[in-house]
From Swiss-Prot:
Origin species: Glycine max
Sites annotated Important for catalytic activity: 105
Stated family: Belongs to the chalcone isomerase family.
Induction: In roots by B.japonicum.
GN (gene name): CHI1A
Pfam families assigned to the protein according to its UniProt record, in alphabetical order: Chalcone (PF02431)
Annotated protein name in UniProt: Chalcone--flavanone isomerase 1A
Stored Gene3D superfamilies: 1.10.890.20, 3.50.70.10
A GO term, aspect molecular function: chalcone isomerase activity
Further remarks about this protein from its record: Part of the biosynthetic pathway for all classes of flavonoids, a large class of secondary plant metabolites, many of which are brightly colored.
EC number: 5.5.1.6
Pathway assigned in UniProt: Secondary metabolite biosynthesis; flavonoid biosynthesis
Highest classification ranks of the organism: Eukaryota, Viridiplantae, Streptophyta, Embryophyta, Tracheophyta
Isomerase listed as a keyword: yes
Amino acid sequence: MATISAVQVEFLEFPAVVTSPASGKTYFLGGAGERGLTIEGKFIKFTGIGVYLEDKAVPSLAAKWKGKTSEELVHTLHFYRDIISGPFEKLIRGSKILPLAGAEYSKKVMENCVAHMKSVGTYGDAEAAAIEKFAEAFKNVNFAPGASVFYRQSPDGILGLSFSEDATIPEKEAAVIENKAVSAAVLETMIGEHAVSPDLKRSLASRLPAVLSHGIIV
């Protein structure tokens, strides 16, 4: 059995296992990493992102990816796409390293999501309406350092949003968006072809081989 460990990103700790009071489910940490931008030649870290997976992700991903090395997985887009589209629930935590207005944060997320959906032909009126609902959820949110947004993604295309002043998962979700393309696009922009966090991709690729080969013990 592989032991799941916590991951530290700057001052943010991503525990090995979390239970969501909103869904009642327990998730293990697939990986975590930083997201930043190079501004005037200096890399500034803005956010730590952790991707948590439901335990049924292990047999689902192992069917195709068991036995692959970290080096093989990190360069394989289909591996990440199988995490994104897999028939298991995901819980993504995005915690701020620097303060950020919710509207500013969501604007960039939405731009990336819309660009991806347009590129793959999944953006239509329903997706535009879902993106509007996404924007509305963040309108009055301001993230202090350590504050978090949680994205709960169910296999049937439901995206649950919740906000916390720390790493605590709220009991109630602030918004629920029922749109599979938008839900998938959120994670795609983080770990897909044009990922905002290569660090997160590396973390998933380094941690999951042992889990897929040996199962998990937490």
